[in-house]
Amino acid sequence: MSDKKTRVEKDSMGELRVPVAALYAAQTQRAVDNFPVSSLRLPKAFIQAIARIKKAAALVNMELGLLEPNLGKAIVDAAQKILDGKHDDHFPVDVFQTGSGTSTNMNVNEVIASLAAGRAGEKVSANDHVNMGQSSNDVIPAAIHVSAALETDRSLLPALEHLAEIIEKKAATLESVVKTGRTHLMDAMPVRMSQELGGWALQIRNGIDRIRAVLPRLHRLAQGGTAVGTGINAHPSFAARVAEVLEQETAVPFKPNASFFESLSAQDTAVELSGQLKVVAVSLIKIANDLRWMNSGPLAGLGEIELPALQPGSSIMPGKVNPVIPEATAMVAAQVIGNDATITVAGQSGSFQLNVMLPLIAYNLLQSIEILANVSRLLADKAITAFVVREDNLQVALARNPILVTALNPLIGYMKAAEIAKAAYKEGRPIVEVAAEMTGLSREELEKLLDPAVLTKGGIQE
């Protein structure tokens, strides 16, 4: 960088040139220079969580008489600007950096200090004022919990609730639609389509419950543990008051963790939440795969439903339309499962008093939350709510399904039923015709016993 485009900043290691328009200072620039690893940056939600903590810390430190009001109010104002999204391009530090996330903590400290200095009319120290009573070692773990809690509450859970509701509403419209059930992808006893979708809905509902079960632990914060969990350099009331301020600002019941040593050295709650996100991802893959199979064809596949045609499916085959939303859903699920593996490894990386893969956990956890939320709404609104059932195809398949003979087992026995099924398969005839010839049951009795709609109710046919 030329001298005209830079200014000189100084930290404990000496002087360094920084872009003249940058709100950050020397420590951020060192991180930019040290870690040109990827194009990945920590999410906006995470940066805002740190800013939220800085704002709360300044308010509490003023209240405790530790921070001069002129400086404290300027810090609060600067942090709010970050929360308002006004300076998003001033956080350039790579995800792959120091494992404590110190570079990102100092990036936020420096930007706030720069903004606050203008309002205060005097120098604001990134370390002594903005970072007062704090350490990167408690700020970053706390920010993981704060950002994940807020994004889960405001984005993911509403999206999953929406998906479950859409599935349930769709199921209610399909109560009378009977189709061939399948196990091992092979023809089985009939089911109502509403029953099939009811299974999907419960998967999502259970996923919501699993995520909600993690939230009380996610609301427990590391803030106040400072460097190693002892709370050195933080006022005894600091942790509780910061949590109270965060609760007032967000309506989320944040509290100090029962052990800051656990908060700093382990990331078990993040690992737990990621695991529950993985369960949701697995559920979404199952739903997406069912939709793709049901939509397959339109002529040489199952052809049970028709998904909305959203875009041309091929650059070479005219007229081809693909199940793009289920495919996108499956890819999101694969990414979330991969993120969970990464978070699992990162969660193991807490040697003694500090986990040293915190930025990686933050990035992957928040990505999983974001993409699951977004794709859940797409799956609901662009696939499930609008698919059309091809009842003619369903009826043809039902009429030719020899497995319906299972309902006769209590009357004629398994072996006789197997003979009938094999004959129907071999001759390609309806099961009712073959059973009428091979049993003493009348056609009228058989049509009643083998009515697909009745068979979906379970029980013993008599």
Please report, for each region that a protein language model flagged, where it lies by residue.
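Conserved, well-structured ligand/cofactor-binding cores
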Residues: 1-462
